[in-house]
Amino acid sequence: MRIILLGPPGAGKGTQAKLISEKFSIPHISTGDIFRANIKEKTPLGIEAKRYIDNGQLVPDEVTIGIVKDRLTKDDCDNGFLLDGFPRTVAQAEALDEFLKGINKELDVALLIKVPEEFILERMTGRRVCTSCGASYHIRFNPPKIEGKCDICDNELIQRKDDTEATVKERLEVYSKQTYPLINYYKDNGIISEVNGTESINEVFGNISNILGRDK
């Protein structure tokens, strides 16, 4: 089974990807992980990607596509894969389809985890992390016993820069601009399936499992 996972930042894609990977015995392929692995191994594509990242630039499509293609040729992808973080644009989606067609394969489903913006804002801006031990909390869903203090080591809890309202809104705007055309692309291809990401982890995964069971 070959799956694309779509959804806004904070939609719980990482959690669901892990569950899908385990249940269906397919590798969870995150573009971030691929970049880090290639940079660490100093592959030609990794060296090129690092050059852009070090200069604060977006890695061009041709480099990203090259790294993803290389990963998809590994033996563990023979029976399928779950792609997370790629494609991000229609151009990348078209390149992926062309590559798969060249090896007589195609995507089975593009899974979209739908979560309203206000829900994402509450989920992400409410996150707090301990400055000492790294324990995670949420001011509403998983609050510490004493406000602003870690239950484990009693050190200060902070909000990460990535979780400020301004940063979250900016990330959502980028996601919206990039991903809506991508959603329409997969709708036109007839392979998109949507799940409600505001439900519990188990409920979301149950719905995903039902969809993937139908598409097997």
UniProtKB/Swiss-Prot annotation:
GO terms for biological process: AMP salvage. The gene is adk. Residues 126-163 are annotated as: LID. ATP binds at residues 10-15, 127, 136-137, 199. It catalyses: AMP + ATP = 2 ADP. PANTHER family: NUCLEOTIDE KINASE. Monomer. Its EC number is 2.7.4.3. AMP binds at residues 31, 36, 57-59, 85-88, 92, 160, 171. Coiled coil: none annotated. GO terms for molecular function: adenylate kinase activity; ATP binding; zinc ion binding. It is an enzyme of class 2 (transferase). Pathway: Purine metabolism; AMP biosynthesis via salvage pathway; AMP from ADP: step 1/1. Its main location: cytoplasm. This is Adenylate kinase. The lineage of its organism: Bacteria, Bacillati, Bacillota, Clostridia, Eubacteriales. Belongs to the adenylate kinase family. It is found in: Cytoplasm. Keywords: ATP-binding, Cytoplasm, Kinase, Metal-binding, Nucleotide biosynthesis, Nucleotide-binding, Transferase, Zinc. InterPro entries: Adenyl_kin_sub (IPR006259), Adenylat/UMP-CMP_kin (IPR000850), Adenylat_kinase_CS (IPR033690), Adenylate_kinase_lid-dom (IPR007862), P-loop_NTPase (IPR027417). Consists of three domains, a large central CORE domain and two small peripheral domains, NMPbind and LID, which undergo movements during catalysis. The LID domain closes over the site of phosphoryl transfer upon ATP binding. Assembling and dissambling the active center during each catalytic cycle provides an effective means to prevent ATP hydrolysis. Some bacteria have evolved a zinc-coordinating structure that stabilizes the LID domain.
